Amino acid sequence: PQALSPRGVWKKFTPKGLFETVKKDDLYFRATGGGVTFGGGEPLLSCKEILHFHKHCMDNGKNWKINIETSLNVPGIFAEVLVGLVDHWIVDIKDMNPEIYEAYTGKDNKFVIDNLQHLIANKAKITVRVPLIPEFNTESNVEKSIEALHKMGITDIDRFTYTIKTH
């Protein structure tokens, strides 16, 4: 895993190095029930490092919550490795319509749907983020995505609008 430092420089972490960096927040994590959220880029591509980080935490008596903010657009094995240890999955779905999804991301959403179904089957805690993306989907598309998610059993849905910066 890596993180952006306050100086705007990316820093790479080993699982042990990340543990050493965040352990100073242990009291806060225990007081609030908090933990570490992996996001940015696609954290599931670092699933082995996240797994090793979690193991290092447990080996050191730290049962911090692990959250993943993901697109889920990776082969199933990447998510499967973490299913039992992730406390909360935050999934940016873009749109459930395959054509809209591909127009926006350049990829199909088969992995997304398959992985989402796998998480649901494993009773994972999931929040799905469904954005209105100007020039890519409409309010009606967002409603259809939410309806499809409800049919799958998803109840925690974060609907929002992408903000496009103008110069």
Residue ranges and their predicted role:
Residues K16:
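Alpha/beta-hydrolase active-site loop
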Residues F19, K23-Y162:
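Conserved AdoMet/S-adenosylmethionine-binding subsite of the radical SAM
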Residues P1-K12:
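Canonical Radical SAM [4Fe-4S] cluster-binding loop centered on the CxxxCxxC motif
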